[in-house]
Amino acid sequence: MRFTETKATTRRGWTALLAAACLFATLVAIAAPGDADSAPLRVVVLGQTSETPPASCPGKIVNNVEITPCRVEGHVTGFQSIADGVPRPFEAPFEGKIVAWSITLAKPSTKETKTTTDEVSFFDEFLGTPAQARIGILRPVEGSKPPKYTLVRQSPTEVLNPYFGSTPVFALDHPLTVLKGQVVALTIPTWAPMFALNLSPENSWRGSRLPEHCISKEDIQGGHPQQGVGKTKTYGCYYSEARLLYTATLVKKP
């Protein structure tokens, strides 16, 4: 096993939420068909691409040798800089509300067998338990090098273990306001198996670690995700050929 560097709703609940949004948009369009200022509800899924790569976990053991390690991320806040060739996929293109977010989770092994190790227990011991995640809204600090971001708001933390092997969607009871140009980041207080490695160079992400403290086990374990609202943090690590598997749904009322 290696490192790489609200209220949960069911899929039915999220489908209903989107259906309600679409219905609202339709009613607005019908109510004022001649109004030049009227416009349909805008819904954008930040981070969504035509294909989602599988998470790099669980690992595989052959003849007691770890051939393919389970890859996870932990103790970090990060966001995708490029996803499948799309630049700045988590930068808000307009002011609106983040109403939900999703995360694609692998199913790490929980038992010692001839082909697997107890990955969950390993990561629990090394990074903390349970597996957790939340999203945050970051405001870039202009002119900062390496780049710095200020956390302006964040969602509640979600426990991920019950959702291993699936892609849960978490609808927010209190949607998060995001301004144009701000970034929706993923925060991992402990660890999460939502990481895809060995992708094309058209995938890269930036993490909240200091330069030269990006890849060792000590760097990962000693990392601190950005969870203090109003605080500013340096995002000094840039990881290529990898992807954080999450999305955020941005809505703008007409």
Range-by-range predicted roles:
Residues L18-A29:
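Bacterial N-terminal signal peptides
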Residues R71-P93, T167:
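Short beta-strands within extracellular/lumenal beta-sheet-rich domains
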Residues A39-C70, S121-D219:
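Aromatic- and Gly/Pro-enriched, solvent-exposed loop/edge beta-strand patches characteristic
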Residues A32-S38:
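Sec/Tat signal peptide C-region and signal peptidase I cleavage site
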